[in-house]
Amino acid sequence: MVSDNIVMKIHEQYLTETNEQVLLRHKKRTGEPAHIGVIQENMNEVLLMINNVGSSGNKEQDLLEIATHILGVITWRQPFMDGNRRTGIIAAGKFLRDNGYRLSIDPEEKNLELRSILRMLKNQLLTLNQEVMRQLSFYISQRIRNYEPRR
C-alpha cells in the first residue's frame, strides 16, 4: 500500500551518497578513476531549487515536479565533481521508489532522447531553461509506473 504522504525534503547526504554509489559502480565496471567530491555552492543551489517545488497538494503532480527537478537541476548546476547526469537519474528514480512509483527508462547510454534533453540543460549557463524542464517533465511523466515491492 502506497502512503498518501510524500517523502518531501531531499538532503545533501541523500544526493552525495547516491553520487558516490554511482561513481564507485562506474569505476568497478570500467576501471576509470572516480572523482568524488561536492561543489558546495552548487549543491546549496540544487537543494534550494529541489525543495521549493512540489507543493500543489496533488501527489502525482508534486512527485513529477520534484523528480523532474532532481534530475534537471543536478544536470544543470553540476554539484558533483563527476557523474552528475547519472546521479540525477538514479536519485530521481530512488525518490520516486521511496514514494511508491518507479521510473522506467532505458540506460542513459541507449537513451538518445533523454541524453539530448539533459545536454540542453547542461549547456544553459545562467538560467534553468523552463521549456527544456517541461520537456523533461513530459519525458518522465511517460515513464512513471506504480511500484510494488517484492514480498
Predicted regions, residues:
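FIC/Doc superfamily catalytic core
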Residues: 1-151
